[in-house]
From Swiss-Prot:
It comes from Bordetella bronchiseptica (strain ATCC BAA-588 / NCTC 13252 / RB50). Pathway: Amino-acid biosynthesis; L-isoleucine biosynthesis; L-isoleucine from 2-oxobutanoate: step 3/4; Amino-acid biosynthesis; L-valine biosynthesis; L-valine from pyruvate: step 3/4. The modification N6-carboxylysine is found at residue 125. Pfam families: ILV_EDD_C, ILVD_EDD_N. This is Dihydroxy-acid dehydratase 3. Belongs to the IlvD/Edd family. InterPro entries: DHAD_IlvD/Edd, Dihydro-acid_dehy_C, DihydroxyA_deHydtase, DiOHA_6PGluconate_deHydtase_CS, ILV_EDD_C, ILV_EDD_N, IlvD/EDD_N. The lineage of its organism: Bacteria, Pseudomonadati, Pseudomonadota, Betaproteobacteria, Burkholderiales.
Length: 561
Protein backbone atom coordinates (compact mmCIF):
# COMPACT_ATOMS: atom_id res chain seq x y z
CA UNK A 1 0.00 0.00 0.00
CA UNK A 2 1.34 3.44 -0.92
CA UNK A 3 2.16 6.09 1.69
CA UNK A 4 -0.48 8.36 0.17
CA UNK A 5 -3.23 5.79 -0.16
CA UNK A 6 -5.87 8.29 1.04
CA UNK A 7 -4.66 11.60 -0.34
CA UNK A 8 -4.16 10.14 -3.82
CA UNK A 9 -7.96 10.29 -4.15
CA UNK A 10 -7.61 14.04 -4.64
CA UNK A 11 -4.12 14.26 -6.20
CA UNK A 12 -3.92 11.53 -8.86
CA UNK A 13 -5.37 11.31 -12.35
CA UNK A 14 -6.43 13.68 -15.12
CA UNK A 15 -9.71 14.52 -13.42
CA UNK A 16 -7.85 15.82 -10.38
CA UNK A 17 -5.95 18.54 -12.26
CA UNK A 18 -8.10 21.29 -10.65
CA UNK A 19 -7.37 19.80 -7.21
CA UNK A 20 -3.65 19.79 -7.87
CA UNK A 21 -3.84 23.38 -9.09
CA UNK A 22 -5.00 24.39 -5.61
CA UNK A 23 -2.02 22.59 -4.08
CA UNK A 24 0.40 24.32 -6.45
CA UNK A 25 -0.94 27.62 -5.10
CA UNK A 26 0.21 26.45 -1.66
CA UNK A 27 3.76 25.82 -2.89
CA UNK A 28 3.52 22.09 -3.61
CA UNK A 29 5.64 20.48 -6.32
CA UNK A 30 4.67 17.54 -8.49
CA UNK A 31 6.94 15.27 -6.45
CA UNK A 32 5.09 16.20 -3.25
CA UNK A 33 1.99 14.37 -4.44
CA UNK A 34 3.77 11.05 -3.95
CA UNK A 35 4.23 11.76 -0.24
CA UNK A 36 1.61 11.43 2.50
CA UNK A 37 -0.51 14.40 3.54
CA UNK A 38 -0.31 14.80 7.32
CA UNK A 39 -2.86 16.93 9.12
CA UNK A 40 -1.75 19.03 12.06
CA UNK A 41 -4.79 19.84 14.17
CA UNK A 42 -3.44 22.86 16.02
CA UNK A 43 -5.30 23.94 19.14
CA UNK A 44 -3.18 27.06 19.66
CA UNK A 45 -5.18 29.89 21.18
CA UNK A 46 -4.64 32.98 23.28
CA UNK A 47 -7.95 32.34 25.05
CA UNK A 48 -6.24 30.32 27.77
CA UNK A 49 -2.74 29.60 29.11
CA UNK A 50 -3.52 25.91 28.53
CA UNK A 51 -3.26 26.52 24.77
CA UNK A 52 -1.14 29.66 24.50
CA UNK A 53 2.07 27.66 24.22
CA UNK A 54 0.99 25.29 21.45
CA UNK A 55 2.26 27.16 18.40
CA UNK A 56 5.91 26.31 18.95
CA UNK A 57 4.91 22.65 19.35
CA UNK A 58 3.00 22.84 16.09
CA UNK A 59 5.98 24.48 14.38
CA UNK A 60 8.24 21.67 15.59
CA UNK A 61 5.79 19.04 14.36
CA UNK A 62 5.44 20.74 10.97
CA UNK A 63 9.19 20.80 10.43
CA UNK A 64 9.55 17.17 11.51
CA UNK A 65 6.85 16.14 9.03
CA UNK A 66 8.71 17.90 6.21
CA UNK A 67 12.01 16.29 7.19
CA UNK A 68 10.23 12.92 7.13
CA UNK A 69 9.26 13.48 3.47
CA UNK A 70 5.61 14.19 4.13
CA UNK A 71 3.37 17.20 3.60
CA UNK A 72 2.04 19.04 6.68
CA UNK A 73 -1.49 20.42 6.39
CA UNK A 74 -2.29 22.71 9.30
CA UNK A 75 -5.77 23.54 10.50
CA UNK A 76 -7.15 24.99 13.70
CA UNK A 77 -9.41 23.59 16.39
CA UNK A 78 -11.38 25.67 18.91
CA UNK A 79 -11.02 25.58 22.67
CA UNK A 80 -12.93 26.69 25.72
CA UNK A 81 -11.10 27.63 28.90
CA UNK A 82 -12.71 25.62 31.66
CA UNK A 83 -10.92 27.68 34.29
CA UNK A 84 -12.14 30.98 32.86
CA UNK A 85 -15.70 29.88 32.13
CA UNK A 86 -16.08 28.05 35.47
CA UNK A 87 -19.06 29.14 37.52
CA UNK A 88 -20.66 30.99 34.60
CA UNK A 89 -23.05 30.26 31.76
CA UNK A 90 -19.97 29.84 29.57
CA UNK A 91 -19.15 26.52 31.27
CA UNK A 92 -22.16 25.03 29.47
CA UNK A 93 -20.06 25.18 26.30
CA UNK A 94 -17.17 23.17 27.75
CA UNK A 95 -18.45 19.63 27.16
CA UNK A 96 -20.06 20.85 23.95
CA UNK A 97 -16.58 21.81 22.77
CA UNK A 98 -15.46 18.18 23.14
CA UNK A 99 -17.96 17.21 20.46
CA UNK A 100 -17.17 20.27 18.34
CA UNK A 101 -13.43 19.53 18.42
CA UNK A 102 -14.03 15.90 17.43
CA UNK A 103 -16.30 17.02 14.61
CA UNK A 104 -13.84 19.70 13.43
CA UNK A 105 -10.93 17.27 13.19
CA UNK A 106 -13.04 14.59 11.52
CA UNK A 107 -14.44 17.11 9.05
CA UNK A 108 -11.06 18.53 8.02
CA UNK A 109 -9.19 15.23 7.90
CA UNK A 110 -11.89 13.29 6.08
CA UNK A 111 -12.83 16.13 3.77
CA UNK A 112 -9.21 16.54 2.69
CA UNK A 113 -8.38 12.80 2.58
CA UNK A 114 -5.45 13.23 4.97
CA UNK A 115 -3.19 10.20 5.36
CA UNK A 116 -2.49 10.83 9.04
CA UNK A 117 -3.20 13.40 11.75
CA UNK A 118 -1.14 14.91 14.56
CA UNK A 119 -3.50 16.36 17.14
CA UNK A 120 -2.05 19.07 19.40
CA UNK A 121 -4.17 20.20 22.33
CA UNK A 122 -4.02 21.62 25.82
CA UNK A 123 -7.19 22.43 27.75
CA UNK A 124 -9.44 19.72 29.14
CA UNK A 125 -11.85 19.00 26.28
CA UNK A 126 -9.10 19.20 23.65
CA UNK A 127 -7.98 15.83 24.94
CA UNK A 128 -11.04 13.60 24.51
CA UNK A 129 -12.25 15.60 21.52
CA UNK A 130 -9.06 14.90 19.60
CA UNK A 131 -8.92 11.24 20.60
CA UNK A 132 -12.57 10.70 19.70
CA UNK A 133 -11.85 12.04 16.22
CA UNK A 134 -8.86 9.74 15.74
CA UNK A 135 -10.86 6.76 16.98
CA UNK A 136 -13.83 7.55 14.75
CA UNK A 137 -11.79 8.01 11.58
CA UNK A 138 -9.28 5.22 12.22
CA UNK A 139 -6.73 7.20 10.23
CA UNK A 140 -3.16 6.93 11.60
CA UNK A 141 -2.85 9.51 14.35
CA UNK A 142 -0.98 10.59 17.45
CA UNK A 143 -1.85 12.92 20.31
CA UNK A 144 0.60 15.63 21.32
CA UNK A 145 -0.34 17.09 24.69
CA UNK A 146 0.58 20.74 25.08
CA UNK A 147 2.12 20.12 28.47
CA UNK A 148 1.41 21.02 32.04
CA UNK A 149 1.84 24.38 33.68
CA UNK A 150 4.49 24.80 36.33
CA UNK A 151 3.19 25.48 39.83
CA UNK A 152 2.87 28.97 41.19
CA UNK A 153 4.40 29.86 44.54
CA UNK A 154 3.36 32.00 47.49
CA UNK A 155 4.66 31.91 51.05
CA UNK A 156 6.53 28.68 50.41
CA UNK A 157 3.54 26.78 49.04
CA UNK A 158 2.92 25.44 45.54
CA UNK A 159 -0.21 26.91 43.97
CA UNK A 160 -2.56 25.77 41.22
CA UNK A 161 -5.82 27.14 39.83
CA UNK A 162 -7.68 25.20 42.54
CA UNK A 163 -5.80 27.22 45.16
CA UNK A 164 -7.60 30.29 43.87
CA UNK A 165 -11.06 28.69 43.87
CA UNK A 166 -10.55 27.52 47.46
CA UNK A 167 -9.25 30.95 48.45
CA UNK A 168 -12.64 32.38 47.45
CA UNK A 169 -14.30 30.36 50.20
CA UNK A 170 -11.63 31.25 52.76
CA UNK A 171 -11.86 34.95 51.93
CA UNK A 172 -15.65 35.03 52.21
CA UNK A 173 -15.41 33.36 55.63
CA UNK A 174 -12.91 35.94 56.84
CA UNK A 175 -10.16 33.33 57.11
CA UNK A 176 -7.93 35.11 54.61
CA UNK A 177 -7.14 38.80 54.27
CA UNK A 178 -7.33 40.69 51.00
CA UNK A 179 -3.54 40.88 50.60
CA UNK A 180 -3.15 37.10 50.63
CA UNK A 181 -6.26 36.65 48.50
CA UNK A 182 -4.97 38.95 45.75
CA UNK A 183 -1.48 37.46 45.94
CA UNK A 184 -2.80 33.92 45.43
CA UNK A 185 -4.91 35.13 42.52
CA UNK A 186 -1.88 36.73 40.87
CA UNK A 187 0.71 34.02 41.64
CA UNK A 188 -1.18 30.78 41.02
CA UNK A 189 -0.57 30.50 37.28
CA UNK A 190 2.94 31.61 36.32
CA UNK A 191 2.92 30.81 32.60
CA UNK A 192 1.64 28.62 29.79
CA UNK A 193 0.43 25.06 30.12
CA UNK A 194 -2.56 23.14 31.43
CA UNK A 195 -3.60 23.18 35.08
CA UNK A 196 -0.85 21.56 37.10
CA UNK A 197 -2.37 18.92 39.38
CA UNK A 198 -3.76 15.56 38.32
CA UNK A 199 -6.76 17.45 37.02
CA UNK A 200 -8.62 16.59 33.82
CA UNK A 201 -6.04 17.59 31.18
CA UNK A 202 -3.15 15.87 32.95
CA UNK A 203 -5.35 12.87 33.71
CA UNK A 204 -6.30 12.44 30.07
CA UNK A 205 -2.77 13.02 28.77
CA UNK A 206 -1.44 10.40 31.20
CA UNK A 207 -4.15 8.00 30.10
CA UNK A 208 -3.35 8.58 26.41
CA UNK A 209 0.29 7.77 27.09
CA UNK A 210 -0.74 4.62 28.96
CA UNK A 211 -3.08 3.66 26.12
CA UNK A 212 -0.24 3.99 23.62
CA UNK A 213 -1.49 6.98 21.61
CA UNK A 214 1.15 9.41 22.91
CA UNK A 215 4.89 9.01 23.36
CA UNK A 216 6.45 7.80 26.63
CA UNK A 217 7.12 10.58 29.18
CA UNK A 218 5.29 13.16 27.01
CA UNK A 219 2.23 13.50 29.24
CA UNK A 220 3.95 15.04 32.27
CA UNK A 221 6.35 17.46 30.57
CA UNK A 222 5.94 21.17 31.24
CA UNK A 223 4.82 23.23 28.27
CA UNK A 224 7.57 25.79 28.73
CA UNK A 225 10.43 23.27 28.73
CA UNK A 226 12.44 22.55 25.59
CA UNK A 227 11.93 18.80 25.97
CA UNK A 228 8.26 19.39 25.16
CA UNK A 229 9.21 20.90 21.79
CA UNK A 230 11.53 17.98 21.07
CA UNK A 231 8.76 15.55 22.01
CA UNK A 232 6.35 17.24 19.60
CA UNK A 233 8.86 16.85 16.78
CA UNK A 234 9.48 13.20 17.65
CA UNK A 235 5.73 12.59 17.82
CA UNK A 236 5.33 13.89 14.27
CA UNK A 237 8.18 11.71 13.03
CA UNK A 238 6.66 8.65 14.71
CA UNK A 239 3.28 9.44 13.16
CA UNK A 240 4.74 9.56 9.64
CA UNK A 241 6.27 6.13 10.27
CA UNK A 242 2.89 4.88 11.51
CA UNK A 243 1.33 6.11 8.26
CA UNK A 244 3.91 4.15 6.27
CA UNK A 245 3.26 1.03 8.36
CA UNK A 246 -0.52 1.67 8.36
CA UNK A 247 -0.65 1.42 12.13
CA UNK A 248 -4.10 2.80 12.92
CA UNK A 249 -5.81 4.05 16.10
CA UNK A 250 -8.06 1.01 16.38
CA UNK A 251 -4.99 -1.22 16.34
CA UNK A 252 -3.99 0.61 19.51
CA UNK A 253 -7.29 1.63 21.14
CA UNK A 254 -8.64 -1.74 22.27
CA UNK A 255 -10.46 -2.98 25.33
CA UNK A 256 -7.13 -4.06 26.81
CA UNK A 257 -5.44 -0.70 26.18
CA UNK A 258 -8.40 1.17 27.66
CA UNK A 259 -8.04 -1.06 30.72
CA UNK A 260 -4.39 0.04 30.87
CA UNK A 261 -5.42 3.68 30.63
CA UNK A 262 -8.02 3.36 33.37
CA UNK A 263 -5.55 1.49 35.60
CA UNK A 264 -3.16 4.44 35.32
CA UNK A 265 -6.00 6.88 36.03
CA UNK A 266 -6.75 4.97 39.23
CA UNK A 267 -3.09 4.69 40.22
CA UNK A 268 -2.50 8.42 39.80
CA UNK A 269 -5.70 9.67 41.44
CA UNK A 270 -7.10 11.14 38.22
CA UNK A 271 -10.20 13.15 37.39
CA UNK A 272 -13.82 11.98 37.50
CA UNK A 273 -14.14 13.39 33.99
CA UNK A 274 -12.07 10.48 32.74
CA UNK A 275 -15.09 8.22 33.26
CA UNK A 276 -17.25 10.33 30.96
CA UNK A 277 -14.50 10.77 28.37
CA UNK A 278 -13.40 7.15 28.15
CA UNK A 279 -16.99 6.07 27.67
CA UNK A 280 -17.02 8.50 24.74
CA UNK A 281 -13.64 7.37 23.36
CA UNK A 282 -14.65 3.70 23.56
CA UNK A 283 -17.88 4.55 21.75
CA UNK A 284 -15.91 6.32 19.01
CA UNK A 285 -13.56 3.34 18.65
CA UNK A 286 -16.46 0.86 18.77
CA UNK A 287 -14.90 -0.88 21.77
CA UNK A 288 -17.35 -2.59 24.16
CA UNK A 289 -17.07 -0.61 27.39
CA UNK A 290 -19.52 0.48 30.07
CA UNK A 291 -19.59 2.36 33.33
CA UNK A 292 -19.28 -0.81 35.42
CA UNK A 293 -15.89 -1.54 33.85
CA UNK A 294 -14.42 1.38 35.80
CA UNK A 295 -15.58 -0.15 39.07
CA UNK A 296 -14.11 -3.52 38.10
CA UNK A 297 -10.68 -1.94 37.57
CA UNK A 298 -10.93 0.30 40.64
CA UNK A 299 -11.27 -2.70 42.92
CA UNK A 300 -7.94 -4.19 41.83
CA UNK A 301 -5.71 -1.12 41.24
CA UNK A 302 -4.28 0.84 44.19
CA UNK A 303 -3.55 4.57 44.29
CA UNK A 304 0.26 4.88 44.28
CA UNK A 305 0.74 8.58 43.44
CA UNK A 306 0.32 11.47 45.88
CA UNK A 307 -0.98 14.13 43.53
CA UNK A 308 -3.25 17.15 43.79
CA UNK A 309 -6.14 17.84 44.21
CA UNK A 310 -6.31 15.53 47.23
CA UNK A 311 -2.55 14.92 47.50
CA UNK A 312 0.62 17.01 47.74
CA UNK A 313 2.29 17.08 44.35
CA UNK A 314 1.78 18.33 40.79
CA UNK A 315 2.50 16.85 37.36
CA UNK A 316 6.02 18.27 37.11
CA UNK A 317 6.88 16.46 40.36
CA UNK A 318 5.53 13.25 38.85
CA UNK A 319 7.68 13.83 35.77
CA UNK A 320 10.84 14.18 37.85
CA UNK A 321 9.97 10.99 39.73
CA UNK A 322 9.85 8.96 36.50
CA UNK A 323 6.54 9.96 35.00
CA UNK A 324 3.90 7.64 33.63
CA UNK A 325 6.46 5.00 32.47
CA UNK A 326 7.52 4.52 36.10
CA UNK A 327 3.89 4.21 37.22
CA UNK A 328 3.21 1.74 34.42
CA UNK A 329 6.27 -0.38 35.21
CA UNK A 330 5.10 -0.78 38.80
CA UNK A 331 1.62 -1.76 37.62
CA UNK A 332 3.00 -4.10 34.95
CA UNK A 333 5.18 -5.94 37.46
CA UNK A 334 2.12 -6.33 39.69
CA UNK A 335 0.14 -7.92 36.87
CA UNK A 336 -2.18 -4.92 36.60
CA UNK A 337 -1.42 -3.96 32.97
CA UNK A 338 -1.60 -5.73 29.63
CA UNK A 339 2.00 -5.75 28.45
CA UNK A 340 1.17 -7.04 24.97
CA UNK A 341 -0.78 -3.96 23.86
CA UNK A 342 0.76 -2.27 20.82
CA UNK A 343 1.66 1.44 20.99
CA UNK A 344 2.05 4.16 18.37
CA UNK A 345 5.80 3.49 18.16
CA UNK A 346 5.12 -0.09 17.06
CA UNK A 347 6.50 -1.47 20.33
CA UNK A 348 4.38 -3.24 22.90
CA UNK A 349 3.84 -1.79 26.36
CA UNK A 350 6.23 -4.36 27.84
CA UNK A 351 8.91 -3.54 25.26
CA UNK A 352 8.47 0.19 25.90
CA UNK A 353 8.92 -0.29 29.65
CA UNK A 354 11.79 -2.79 29.44
CA UNK A 355 14.46 -0.32 30.57
CA UNK A 356 12.34 1.50 33.16
CA UNK A 357 13.44 0.72 36.75
CA UNK A 358 11.29 -1.74 38.67
CA UNK A 359 11.06 0.56 41.68
CA UNK A 360 10.47 4.30 41.93
CA UNK A 361 13.57 6.38 42.67
CA UNK A 362 14.59 6.78 46.32
CA UNK A 363 14.29 10.10 48.11
CA UNK A 364 10.87 10.97 46.72
CA UNK A 365 7.30 10.25 47.81
CA UNK A 366 5.40 11.18 44.66
CA UNK A 367 5.26 7.58 43.36
CA UNK A 368 5.02 4.79 45.91
CA UNK A 369 5.71 1.06 45.47
CA UNK A 370 2.67 -1.21 45.46
CA UNK A 371 3.39 -2.48 48.98
CA UNK A 372 3.23 1.10 50.28
CA UNK A 373 0.29 2.29 48.20
CA UNK A 374 -1.57 5.33 49.48
CA UNK A 375 -4.86 3.43 49.16
CA UNK A 376 -5.37 -0.27 48.42
CA UNK A 377 -8.05 0.40 45.81
CA UNK A 378 -8.72 3.10 43.25
CA UNK A 379 -10.50 6.33 44.05
CA UNK A 380 -13.07 6.70 41.25
CA UNK A 381 -16.08 4.69 42.38
CA UNK A 382 -19.34 4.02 40.60
CA UNK A 383 -22.23 4.47 43.02
CA UNK A 384 -25.75 3.23 42.39
CA UNK A 385 -29.03 3.27 44.27
CA UNK A 386 -32.53 4.61 43.89
CA UNK A 387 -31.14 8.08 43.12
CA UNK A 388 -28.88 6.88 40.30
CA UNK A 389 -29.92 3.53 38.83
CA UNK A 390 -27.63 4.04 35.82
CA UNK A 391 -24.69 4.93 38.04
CA UNK A 392 -22.78 8.03 39.11
CA UNK A 393 -19.17 8.88 39.92
CA UNK A 394 -17.45 9.81 43.18
CA UNK A 395 -13.89 10.14 44.48
CA UNK A 396 -13.96 8.03 47.62
CA UNK A 397 -10.37 7.75 48.87
CA UNK A 398 -9.11 9.83 51.76
CA UNK A 399 -12.55 10.87 52.98
CA UNK A 400 -12.77 11.51 56.71
CA UNK A 401 -16.51 10.91 56.55
CA UNK A 402 -17.16 8.25 53.89
CA UNK A 403 -20.84 8.01 54.86
CA UNK A 404 -23.21 10.93 55.20
CA UNK A 405 -26.96 11.04 55.69
CA UNK A 406 -28.40 14.50 55.82
CA UNK A 407 -31.15 16.86 54.74
CA UNK A 408 -31.25 17.72 51.05
CA UNK A 409 -30.64 21.35 50.12
CA UNK A 410 -32.13 21.41 46.64
CA UNK A 411 -31.11 23.80 43.85
CA UNK A 412 -32.21 23.70 40.22
CA UNK A 413 -29.03 25.36 38.96
CA UNK A 414 -25.39 25.83 39.94
CA UNK A 415 -25.96 29.58 40.23
CA UNK A 416 -28.64 29.18 42.91
CA UNK A 417 -26.44 26.76 44.86
CA UNK A 418 -23.45 29.08 44.68
CA UNK A 419 -25.53 31.97 46.01
CA UNK A 420 -26.59 29.87 49.00
CA UNK A 421 -23.00 28.82 49.70
CA UNK A 422 -21.65 32.36 49.47
CA UNK A 423 -24.49 33.56 51.74
CA UNK A 424 -23.40 30.86 54.26
CA UNK A 425 -26.78 29.13 54.18
CA UNK A 426 -25.22 25.65 53.99
CA UNK A 427 -24.51 23.89 57.30
CA UNK A 428 -22.56 20.87 58.52
CA UNK A 429 -24.38 17.67 57.59
CA UNK A 430 -26.32 19.10 54.66
CA UNK A 431 -26.43 17.31 51.31
CA UNK A 432 -26.42 19.90 48.54
CA UNK A 433 -28.35 18.79 45.43
CA UNK A 434 -27.60 20.63 42.18
CA UNK A 435 -29.82 19.37 39.39
CA UNK A 436 -31.01 20.24 35.88
CA UNK A 437 -27.31 20.61 35.04
CA UNK A 438 -26.99 17.33 33.09
CA UNK A 439 -26.11 16.84 29.41
CA UNK A 440 -29.64 17.66 28.27
CA UNK A 441 -30.89 19.77 31.13
CA UNK A 442 -28.03 22.24 31.47
CA UNK A 443 -27.51 21.70 28.71
CA UNK A 444 -23.81 20.95 28.68
CA UNK A 445 -23.20 19.36 32.08
CA UNK A 446 -21.32 22.17 33.79
CA UNK A 447 -18.46 21.46 36.21
CA UNK A 448 -19.13 22.35 39.84
CA UNK A 449 -15.65 23.46 40.88
CA UNK A 450 -16.85 26.86 42.11
CA UNK A 451 -19.37 25.53 44.67
CA UNK A 452 -17.22 22.59 45.79
CA UNK A 453 -14.15 24.77 46.24
CA UNK A 454 -16.18 27.40 48.08
CA UNK A 455 -17.39 24.70 50.48
CA UNK A 456 -13.80 23.54 51.04
CA UNK A 457 -12.68 27.12 51.62
CA UNK A 458 -15.45 27.58 54.19
CA UNK A 459 -14.29 24.48 56.05
CA UNK A 460 -17.25 22.36 54.93
CA UNK A 461 -15.46 20.10 52.47
CA UNK A 462 -15.47 17.11 54.84
CA UNK A 463 -18.88 17.63 56.45
CA UNK A 464 -21.20 18.54 53.57
CA UNK A 465 -22.20 16.21 50.75
CA UNK A 466 -22.93 17.37 47.22
CA UNK A 467 -24.65 15.47 44.44
CA UNK A 468 -25.34 16.64 40.90
CA UNK A 469 -26.27 15.50 37.43
CA UNK A 470 -23.56 17.88 36.27
CA UNK A 471 -19.82 17.21 36.37
CA UNK A 472 -16.88 18.10 38.56
CA UNK A 473 -13.57 19.63 37.67
CA UNK A 474 -10.53 17.43 37.99
CA UNK A 475 -9.62 19.79 40.83
CA UNK A 476 -12.62 18.83 42.96
CA UNK A 477 -12.33 16.73 46.10
CA UNK A 478 -14.54 15.92 49.07
CA UNK A 479 -17.83 14.05 49.55
CA UNK A 480 -19.12 14.87 46.09
CA UNK A 481 -21.04 12.72 43.61
CA UNK A 482 -21.46 13.67 39.96
CA UNK A 483 -22.80 12.38 36.64
CA UNK A 484 -25.98 11.24 38.42
CA UNK A 485 -27.97 9.36 35.79
CA UNK A 486 -30.66 9.46 34.61
CA UNK A 487 -30.48 13.24 34.87
CA UNK A 488 -33.24 15.47 36.21
CA UNK A 489 -34.30 16.79 32.80
CA UNK A 490 -35.44 13.35 31.63
CA UNK A 491 -37.19 12.58 34.90
CA UNK A 492 -34.36 10.85 36.72
CA UNK A 493 -34.90 10.31 40.45
CA UNK A 494 -32.72 13.33 41.27
CA UNK A 495 -35.61 15.44 39.91
CA UNK A 496 -37.89 14.03 42.61
CA UNK A 497 -35.87 15.14 45.66
CA UNK A 498 -37.55 17.75 47.83
CA UNK A 499 -35.99 20.24 50.22
CA UNK A 500 -35.26 18.55 53.53
CA UNK A 501 -35.50 14.95 52.28
CA UNK A 502 -33.05 12.54 53.85
CA UNK A 503 -30.29 11.59 51.39
CA UNK A 504 -27.50 9.07 51.98
CA UNK A 505 -24.09 8.97 50.30
CA UNK A 506 -22.30 5.79 51.35
CA UNK A 507 -18.82 5.34 49.90
CA UNK A 508 -18.42 1.96 51.63
CA UNK A 509 -21.56 0.46 50.13
CA UNK A 510 -21.23 2.44 46.86
CA UNK A 511 -24.75 3.71 47.48
CA UNK A 512 -26.63 6.90 46.61
CA UNK A 513 -30.04 6.76 48.21
CA UNK A 514 -33.11 8.94 48.66
CA UNK A 515 -34.65 7.76 51.91
CA UNK A 516 -38.33 7.68 50.99
CA UNK A 517 -40.65 4.78 50.26
CA UNK A 518 -41.09 3.29 46.81
CA UNK A 519 -44.72 4.40 46.94
CA UNK A 520 -43.74 8.01 47.63
CA UNK A 521 -41.14 7.87 44.85
CA UNK A 522 -43.79 6.61 42.40
CA UNK A 523 -46.24 9.31 43.43
CA UNK A 524 -43.64 12.03 42.92
CA UNK A 525 -42.67 10.59 39.54
CA UNK A 526 -46.29 10.67 38.42
CA UNK A 527 -46.59 14.32 39.45
CA UNK A 528 -43.33 15.40 37.79
CA UNK A 529 -43.46 17.37 34.53
CA UNK A 530 -40.51 17.93 32.22
CA UNK A 531 -39.47 21.60 32.07
CA UNK A 532 -39.07 23.40 28.78
CA UNK A 533 -35.56 23.36 27.28
CA UNK A 534 -33.48 26.35 28.32
CA UNK A 535 -32.29 26.85 24.74
CA UNK A 536 -34.17 26.34 21.47
CA UNK A 537 -31.57 27.67 19.00
CA UNK A 538 -27.84 27.33 18.51
CA UNK A 539 -25.21 24.86 19.59
CA UNK A 540 -26.50 24.38 23.15
CA UNK A 541 -29.94 23.51 21.81
CA UNK A 542 -28.38 21.00 19.42
CA UNK A 543 -26.28 19.44 22.16
CA UNK A 544 -29.25 19.21 24.52
CA UNK A 545 -31.28 17.49 21.83
CA UNK A 546 -28.60 15.00 20.76
CA UNK A 547 -26.58 14.20 23.91
CA UNK A 548 -27.14 10.79 25.43
CA UNK A 549 -27.03 9.98 29.13
CA UNK A 550 -23.85 10.54 31.13
CA UNK A 551 -23.64 6.81 31.87
CA UNK A 552 -22.88 6.34 28.16
CA UNK A 553 -20.51 9.29 27.83
CA UNK A 554 -22.93 12.11 26.90
CA UNK A 555 -21.96 11.68 23.24
CA UNK A 556 -24.03 13.19 20.45
CA UNK A 557 -23.83 10.36 17.91
CA UNK A 558 -25.27 7.40 19.83
CA UNK A 559 -28.10 7.05 17.33
CA UNK A 560 -28.03 3.28 17.04
CA UNK A 561 -28.13 2.60 20.77
Amino acid sequence: MSDNNRSRHITEGVARAPNRAMYYALGYTEADFQNPMIGVANGHSTITPCNSGLQRLADAAIEAIRVSRANPQVFGTPTISDGMSMGTEGMKYSLVSREVIADCIETAAQGQWMDGVVVIGGCDKNMPGGMMALARMNVPGIYVYGGTIKPGHYKGKDLTIVSVFEAVGEYTMGRMDETDFKAIEQCAIPGSGSCGGMYTANTMSSAFEAMGMSLPHSSTMANEDQEKVASAAESARVLVEAVRRQLRPRDIITRASIENAVAVIMATGGSTNAVLHFLAIAHAAEVPWNIDDFERIRKRVPVICDLKPSGKYVATDLHRAGGIPQVMKILLNAGLLHGDCITITGKTVAETLANVPDAPPPGQDVIMPIERALYPQGHLAILKGNLSPEGCVAKITGLKNPVITGPARVFDSEDDAMSAIMDRRIRDGDVVVIRYEGPKGGPGMREMLAPTSALVGQGLGETVGLITDGRFSGGTWGMVVGHVAPEAFVGGPIALIREGDSVTIDAHQLLLQLNISDEEMAARRKAWAQPKPRYVRGVLAKFGKLACTASRGAVTDAFEE
